[in-house]
Structure formats: C-alpha cells, structure tokens
Amino acid sequence: MEMAKSIMFGEDARRSMQKGVDILADTVKVTMGPKGRNVVLDKKFGAPLITNDGVTIAREIELEDAYENMGAQLVKEVATKTNDVAGDGTTTATLLAQAIIREGLKNVTGGANPMLVRRGIQMAVEEAVKGIKEISKPVEGKEDIARVAAISADDKEIGKLIADAMEKVGNEGVITVEESNTMGTELDVVEGMQFDRGYVSPYMVTDTEKMEASLDDAYILITDKKITNIQEILPVLEQIVQQGKRLLIISEDIEGEALATLVVNKLRGTFTCVAVKAPGFGDRRKEMLEDIATLTGGQVISEEIGRDLKDVTVDMLGRAESVKITKETTTIVNGKGNKKEIEDRVNQIKAQIEETTSEFDREKLQERLAKLAGGVAVIKVGAATETELKERKLRIEDALAATKAAVEEGIIPGGGTAYAMVIKEVEKLNSETHDIKLGIDIVKKSLEEPVRQIACNAGVEGSIVIEKVKHSEAGIGYDALNNEYVNMIKAGIVDPTKVSRSALQNAASVASTFLTTEAAIADIPEKNDTPMPGAPGMMDGMY
C-alpha cells in the first residue's frame, strides 16, 4: 500500500525547511576559523569522533521532522559537493548557503518573484567568482604550500609535513595518509616505482638479517607469462652471468624446475637473481608491466606482441640503478628508460585520467602516474588516543586536499577576506528589474558572512570587523588568532582559490533553488502503537 503523504505550501513549507537548514548550519559553523570549536559525534561503535570538518559533521545530521530534514539534506548536499570538488571549505559553503537562504526568504516572503531573485543571485555569483579569480595568485614554492596546509589544518607542523611531501614527490606524486601506532606524525617517501609484490622464494634474499634482496645495476626481465622451464630463459641468463650482473624477473609466476634452478644457483653463489610476480590483475597488469618497461627502457615479453621468452636478448631487458625487494614489495629506483618515452607515457595516463568517469579507475591511474612521474609519500599519523588520531587524520586529509586545490588554481587572502574584497565588484552590477536587484543584494550581504562568523567564533563583534575589512585597502583582513588587522597574504593566511570559488558556487546553486520552492511533500509517519500479542512492553528494550 502506498503511504499517505503530507503536503505543505508556500511560506509554511519554506519556513519548516529553513529551520532544518539553520540547525545544520548552526552546528557546522561553530568550527569556523582559528578559534572555531569542535563538534563531537556519537559513534555506534568505539569512541565518539571529535572533529571540526564541516562535511563530516553534516553527514551525521538527520532530523526527526520530515520537512526540517529536507532543508538539512539540501545544505548537506552543498557540503558534500564542495568536498568532492575541492576537498575542503565545506564549513564555508554551508555558512554561505544558510546566509543566502536567510536573506532570500525575507524577500520572497515580502512578495518578490523567486525566479527573478534567483537570476540575480546567479549574476552576482558569476561576478564574485570572476573577482575571486582576479585576486588569485599562483602558488610559489614550498613556503606557500606550507601556509595553505597549515591554515587548513590549523597546525604549523602539519603544514611543514605536507610541504615536505609535496616537494619530494612533485605535483604529480601521490600522497596518502595512514594511521600509525606511534605517538608522532611522520613522513615516509618512496622514491622510484614501487609495487606490492615481493620475492617468490625467501632463499633469494641478499641480506638475511633484514630479509630483503637488493640488486645494484640490475637487469630486469618483464613478461606476462608463467615460467616453469629453465630452458626458456637459459640463453639470456648465460649472457647476464658472463657480464657478472644481477637479474630481476617480473613474470606472471615462476615455479617448478625454473624456480629450483634459480634458488640453487643463488645458494651456490654463482648467480644472483630474484623473481617476483607481476603486479595488478587483468588489463591493469598489462598496463603496469608496460609502465615498468617504459621506466626501465625494456620491453614486455608477451605472446600478444609475438615475443617469445627463448628469443629474448639482453637489449630487450630493462635496466635500473638499484632494485630492492622485500617480502611484500618491490622498489625500482632510477630506471634507465628513455626520458622522452617516459614523458609520453605520463601524458597518455593523464589523458586517460581526464576521460575516465569511474572514481576507482581514476585513483588507480593517479597511482600509476605517481609511480612514473613523481613518487609516493605516506604521511603516518600518530596520536596518544584513537579519538585524537581520527581527528588529526581528518585534518591532514583536508589540508592535503586544500594544498592540491591551491596548486591547481592558486591562492587568495584567507579568513573570508577575499569574499569581502569582491563585494565591490558585485555592487557594480545593476538591473532595471527590482527583483533581480534584490538577488544581487542578497549575495552582497552573504559575502560578509564568513568574516562575521570567524570574528564571532573568536568572541568579537562581527559587524564591526566586517565594516573595518570592507573599508581597508585590498588584501587587509582580520587575523582572528591574534585579534588584529593584517595583510593576509603577507601574514601567510591564505585559502585556495578553488576551495573558495566552489564553496560560493555550490552554496548559491542549492540556496537559489531552495528559494523557488512552493510546495513540499513528505511521508506521513505511521503510528505503530500495537505491541505484539503476548509480549506487552517487550519491544521497548530492544533495538
């Protein structure tokens, strides 16, 4: 049976939904700025989570009243979308959405046409975004990166850590965040290409204490076939033995007599050769082998391209300055591949990243790109307790996203200053149509909100601060941490352009659509009063 629905119209619908918007935004906005507080979230399992990450808080909010919940979910959409695009700035986005809805509803209630108001909002936001892009300046060097990260994470240490990581692996590199069981937070950088396959047999190690094998100036045989018969690779082995070099074999698998022969020779000390299985699966495996071949200047020996193992000569093998193999990983450092070919391969992967629609594929391509072009850095987060660890990890992930965004589109004065700076651009807009003008004014007013909130969270009167910032020269903003007015960029208080831009665009998009709501429909909750027969009150104690 279809559930009955309850329907609300016009003013009532908008008011109830606005209540939900306010509940969500008021919860999130206490975290804004350097003196913002945290919010604690109850978790069904384990310790509660303490965080100041807007989107993490927003995701937790579900309201009982269906209409209020609709409002809250709409604003949650703003936070999530901003998080997807820029990875940070979710609190700002939520705050802006609330401000636009609040100002907009005043006008719509007063009889303005919501469609025209929305038009005005869109015009003003376009103008503001243009203004933000004009004040934006590119990220220059490690200093800037450290600043962006430090502001986002509210922690100078983290800023330095991320800047170090970016410096080591370059903009193409991949930086991941992992939990560690130590107290401190540290950086681990893997130079060269690493994949997660280790030696096939522990007898192949060269250092029995560390249980790892390291091959200097090694040859690398790359194939997608299974090697069982030593005769297949004998010709090429003999050539390498004569040169006194070492060999790494990357193949689908190596077993039986072939494996036994290699191990026996290693133990006798005649020849050092380590075999590992090829990384990845299916098509991705082929691509990864191709990557390794490009990096080391070798060829993939595969029947698909008509190359057979017994025809392999030394010039088909890859070369690398050193290879390190542990039980779980293989790392190839300084492959001797042709620079131009590596560059072509990198560009090819970049093109695939642009085209792919699957998030999973994009991540895997990004990893391959990093291994070819930069390297991989791992930030290992440590803390005294689980609760603090989770909180730190969230902040580092946000800071990392902010840093990437800054590299892409540059930086602007932080602390809400950039929004205040573009108000005068919006003021230049004019419209003959009264209601469109109202939309423009709504945005003008909402752009003050971030500065107000940061001031308010620092215990200062927001109106005074915003007036002061608006009437100071460009680039002067309010430093809430030290309670003074400074040149934001010089003081190192910066935000990524992409984050600020996305926050405003997403907020305006959802908020202006919200204003055009004329009816809201929700399920009527069923009243389930009859307990099961024979078990009065039994159900109360159960979940």
Swiss-Prot record:
GO MF assignments: ATP binding; ATP-dependent protein folding chaperone; isomerase activity; unfolded protein binding
Annotated localization: Cytoplasm
Statement: the UniProt record of this protein carries the keyword Nucleotide-binding: yes
Any Pfam family matching the protein: Cpn60_TCP1
Recorded GO CC terms: cytoplasm
An example Gene Ontology biological process: protein refolding
InterPro entries: Chaperonin_Cpn60_CS, Cpn60/GroEL, Cpn60/GroEL/TCP-1, GroEL-like_apical_dom_sf, GROEL-like_equatorial_sf, TCP-1-like_intermed_sf
Keywords for this protein: ATP-binding, Chaperone, Cytoplasm, Isomerase, Nucleotide-binding
Enzyme Commission code(s) on record: 5.6.1.7
Record field: catalytic activity: ATP + H2O + a folded polypeptide = ADP + phosphate + an unfolded polypeptide
Major localisation: cytoplasm
Binding site for ATP: T31, M32, G33, P34, D88, G89, T90, T91, T92, G415, D479, A480, L481, D495
Recorded family membership: Belongs to the chaperonin (HSP60) family.
Subunit structure: Forms a cylinder of 14 subunits composed of two heptameric rings stacked back-to-back. Interacts with the co-chaperonin GroES.
Function: Together with its co-chaperonin GroES, plays an essential role in assisting protein folding. The GroEL-GroES system forms a nano-cage that allows encapsulation of the non-native substrate proteins and provides a physical environment optimized to promote and accelerate protein folding.
PANTHER family on file: 60 KDA HEAT SHOCK PROTEIN, MITOCHONDRIAL
The name this protein goes by in its record: Chaperonin GroEL
